[in-house]
């Protein structure tokens, strides 16, 4: 399980170092194999351990591709999906098209989302968090039925 937000850097070759606390799980359960793709709703990337990605891939492939919305989702998420492997230094390479999509420069945030990570540019991450916090503080936060039952 991946939790927490980590400030990381993108090196000159387009690689990021996965924080040490996550590496053992990725290596033991996925042989260091991961898949990175775009988030269709946010200017960030989604980084999945291979086994988690395979579950997502099954769900995507089960969608009827005659439905234009389904087809668009498949095209974007599967089209950008790129396999990456942890190297001996715990780094993965983020492809150029993925870096461009998420506007990644040197300073990044790697954000654990339990079964996957989000990769954000530092500026986009902080702007998104400000927006999320403002929504929560506004009192206009629309709660779904599931959220109404959630106790934190």
UniProtKB/Swiss-Prot annotation:
Stored Pfam families: MraZ
GO CC list: cytoplasm; nucleoid
Domain of life, per lineage: Bacteria
Domain named SpoVT-AbrB: residues: 5-52, 81-124
SUPFAM superfamilies with a match to the protein in the record: AbrB/MazE/MraZ-like
GO BP, sorted A to Z: negative regulation of DNA-templated transcription initiation
Statement: the UniProt record of this protein carries the keyword Hydrolase: no
Keywords: Cytoplasm, DNA-binding, Repeat, Transcription, Transcription regulation
Alphabetized GO MF terms: DNA-binding transcription factor activity; transcription cis-regulatory region binding
Signal peptide (UniProt feature, chain positions): none
Subcellular location(s) of the protein: Cytoplasm, Nucleoid
This protein's record includes keyword Cytoplasm: yes
Coarse class of the protein's main subcellular location: cytoplasm
Assembly mode: Forms oligomers.
Family: Belongs to the MraZ family.
Name by which UniProt lists this protein: Transcriptional regulator MraZ
Species this chain originates from: Pasteurella multocida (strain Pm70)
